[in-house]
Regions:
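Peripheral terminal and linker regions in Fe-S/redox and tRNA-modifying enzymes
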Residues: 1-173
Length: 173
Protein backbone atom coordinates (compact mmCIF):
# COMPACT_ATOMS: atom_id res chain seq x y z
CA UNK A 1 0.00 0.00 0.00
CA UNK A 2 1.00 3.57 -0.60
CA UNK A 3 1.74 5.98 2.23
CA UNK A 4 -0.64 8.83 2.92
CA UNK A 5 -0.10 11.81 0.64
CA UNK A 6 2.00 14.53 2.24
CA UNK A 7 0.69 18.09 2.08
CA UNK A 8 2.33 20.42 -0.41
CA UNK A 9 1.59 23.64 -2.21
CA UNK A 10 2.78 25.05 -5.51
CA UNK A 11 3.66 28.69 -4.98
CA UNK A 12 5.62 29.33 -8.17
CA UNK A 13 6.48 27.75 -11.50
CA UNK A 14 10.03 29.06 -11.21
CA UNK A 15 13.31 27.41 -10.39
CA UNK A 16 14.45 26.75 -6.82
CA UNK A 17 15.56 29.73 -4.77
CA UNK A 18 19.24 30.49 -4.64
CA UNK A 19 20.89 29.27 -1.46
CA UNK A 20 24.50 29.62 -0.32
CA UNK A 21 26.71 27.80 -2.80
CA UNK A 22 24.17 28.00 -5.63
CA UNK A 23 23.31 30.68 -8.20
CA UNK A 24 20.62 30.53 -10.89
CA UNK A 25 21.23 32.52 -14.07
CA UNK A 26 18.29 33.22 -16.34
CA UNK A 27 19.01 32.36 -19.97
CA UNK A 28 16.64 34.06 -22.36
CA UNK A 29 15.44 31.49 -24.86
CA UNK A 30 17.54 28.79 -23.20
CA UNK A 31 20.46 29.28 -25.61
CA UNK A 32 23.91 30.00 -24.22
CA UNK A 33 25.40 32.42 -26.71
CA UNK A 34 26.99 35.82 -26.95
CA UNK A 35 24.57 38.49 -28.14
CA UNK A 36 24.18 42.25 -28.10
CA UNK A 37 22.21 41.91 -24.87
CA UNK A 38 24.51 39.56 -22.92
CA UNK A 39 27.81 37.76 -23.31
CA UNK A 40 26.64 34.47 -21.77
CA UNK A 41 29.08 32.14 -23.50
CA UNK A 42 32.09 34.25 -22.53
CA UNK A 43 30.85 34.67 -18.95
CA UNK A 44 30.18 30.97 -18.43
CA UNK A 45 33.57 30.09 -19.92
CA UNK A 46 35.23 32.39 -17.35
CA UNK A 47 33.17 30.90 -14.52
CA UNK A 48 33.91 27.32 -15.65
CA UNK A 49 37.65 28.06 -15.63
CA UNK A 50 37.55 28.66 -11.84
CA UNK A 51 34.48 26.66 -10.70
CA UNK A 52 34.94 23.06 -9.57
CA UNK A 53 31.26 22.37 -8.84
CA UNK A 54 28.38 21.51 -11.11
CA UNK A 55 26.36 23.28 -13.77
CA UNK A 56 22.88 22.13 -14.68
CA UNK A 57 20.03 23.33 -16.87
CA UNK A 58 16.58 23.67 -15.31
CA UNK A 59 13.20 22.86 -16.81
CA UNK A 60 12.77 26.61 -17.37
CA UNK A 61 15.90 26.71 -19.57
CA UNK A 62 18.04 28.48 -16.97
CA UNK A 63 21.50 27.55 -15.72
CA UNK A 64 22.28 26.72 -12.10
CA UNK A 65 25.85 27.05 -10.87
CA UNK A 66 25.97 24.63 -7.93
CA UNK A 67 28.66 23.85 -5.39
CA UNK A 68 30.16 27.34 -5.28
CA UNK A 69 32.83 27.29 -2.59
CA UNK A 70 33.74 30.22 -0.34
CA UNK A 71 37.11 30.32 -2.18
CA UNK A 72 35.51 31.03 -5.56
CA UNK A 73 32.28 32.80 -4.50
CA UNK A 74 33.73 36.33 -4.69
CA UNK A 75 35.31 35.75 -8.11
CA UNK A 76 32.15 34.14 -9.51
CA UNK A 77 29.98 36.99 -8.22
CA UNK A 78 32.45 39.43 -9.79
CA UNK A 79 32.09 37.71 -13.19
CA UNK A 80 28.30 37.72 -12.80
CA UNK A 81 28.38 41.50 -12.18
CA UNK A 82 30.93 42.11 -14.96
CA UNK A 83 28.67 40.46 -17.56
CA UNK A 84 25.38 41.69 -16.04
CA UNK A 85 24.03 38.15 -15.67
CA UNK A 86 21.40 39.24 -13.12
CA UNK A 87 19.68 42.11 -14.94
CA UNK A 88 16.48 43.69 -13.64
CA UNK A 89 14.31 42.02 -16.27
CA UNK A 90 10.55 42.17 -16.33
CA UNK A 91 8.51 39.25 -15.02
CA UNK A 92 7.45 38.65 -18.62
CA UNK A 93 11.06 38.30 -19.87
CA UNK A 94 11.99 36.10 -16.90
CA UNK A 95 9.12 33.77 -17.83
CA UNK A 96 9.57 33.76 -21.60
CA UNK A 97 10.44 30.65 -23.57
CA UNK A 98 10.67 29.79 -27.26
CA UNK A 99 11.64 26.73 -29.26
CA UNK A 100 14.59 27.03 -31.66
CA UNK A 101 12.29 26.97 -34.69
CA UNK A 102 13.71 28.37 -37.94
CA UNK A 103 16.36 27.77 -39.23
CA UNK A 104 17.13 24.77 -36.99
CA UNK A 105 13.92 22.74 -36.88
CA UNK A 106 12.63 21.01 -40.03
CA UNK A 107 9.07 21.07 -38.65
CA UNK A 108 9.01 24.84 -38.07
CA UNK A 109 6.45 26.77 -40.05
CA UNK A 110 7.63 30.19 -38.85
CA UNK A 111 10.14 31.90 -36.55
CA UNK A 112 10.05 31.89 -32.75
CA UNK A 113 13.42 32.02 -30.96
CA UNK A 114 14.62 35.07 -32.90
CA UNK A 115 11.23 36.80 -32.71
CA UNK A 116 10.23 36.37 -29.06
CA UNK A 117 12.85 38.75 -27.55
CA UNK A 118 11.69 41.49 -29.94
CA UNK A 119 8.06 40.87 -29.02
CA UNK A 120 8.93 41.00 -25.31
CA UNK A 121 10.76 44.31 -25.90
CA UNK A 122 7.55 45.73 -27.38
CA UNK A 123 5.36 44.40 -24.57
CA UNK A 124 7.70 45.58 -21.78
CA UNK A 125 7.06 49.25 -22.52
CA UNK A 126 3.34 48.59 -22.03
CA UNK A 127 3.96 46.60 -18.84
CA UNK A 128 5.97 49.44 -17.35
CA UNK A 129 3.27 51.96 -18.25
CA UNK A 130 0.58 49.77 -16.65
CA UNK A 131 2.62 49.07 -13.49
CA UNK A 132 2.94 45.37 -14.32
CA UNK A 133 6.75 45.18 -14.73
CA UNK A 134 7.26 42.64 -11.95
CA UNK A 135 4.19 40.49 -12.67
CA UNK A 136 5.22 36.90 -13.35
CA UNK A 137 3.47 36.48 -16.72
CA UNK A 138 4.46 33.41 -18.71
CA UNK A 139 4.82 33.87 -22.46
CA UNK A 140 5.80 31.11 -24.88
CA UNK A 141 6.33 31.03 -28.62
CA UNK A 142 6.73 28.05 -30.89
CA UNK A 143 7.24 27.73 -34.64
CA UNK A 144 4.67 24.96 -35.13
CA UNK A 145 1.77 23.26 -33.31
CA UNK A 146 4.03 20.57 -31.80
CA UNK A 147 4.58 22.92 -28.86
CA UNK A 148 8.21 22.25 -27.91
CA UNK A 149 8.31 25.37 -25.71
CA UNK A 150 5.13 24.20 -23.89
CA UNK A 151 2.97 27.09 -25.17
CA UNK A 152 -0.27 25.44 -24.13
CA UNK A 153 0.74 25.91 -20.47
CA UNK A 154 1.50 29.63 -20.80
CA UNK A 155 -0.64 32.62 -19.93
CA UNK A 156 0.18 34.12 -23.32
CA UNK A 157 1.22 31.85 -26.19
CA UNK A 158 2.03 32.25 -29.87
CA UNK A 159 1.85 29.02 -31.88
CA UNK A 160 3.19 29.15 -35.44
CA UNK A 161 0.75 28.07 -38.14
CA UNK A 162 2.44 29.40 -41.29
CA UNK A 163 5.07 31.89 -42.46
CA UNK A 164 4.64 34.94 -40.21
CA UNK A 165 1.31 33.65 -38.86
CA UNK A 166 0.53 32.61 -35.29
CA UNK A 167 -2.43 31.41 -33.29
CA UNK A 168 -2.56 33.40 -30.06
CA UNK A 169 -3.61 31.58 -26.92
CA UNK A 170 -4.43 33.34 -23.65
CA UNK A 171 -5.47 32.17 -20.21
CA UNK A 172 -8.24 33.86 -18.31
CA UNK A 173 -8.73 33.42 -14.59
Amino acid sequence: PLQEAKPFSLSTNGDAADVPGRQTIEIEGGRIQNSNRQQLKTAFHEIASIHQGDFFITGNQNLVIDGITPDTAVRIKSIIRKYNLLPNDSGLRRNSSACTSLPFCPQALTDSERLLPKLVDELESQLKELGLWDEEISIRMTGCPNGCSRPYLAELAFVGRGPGKYNIWTVSY
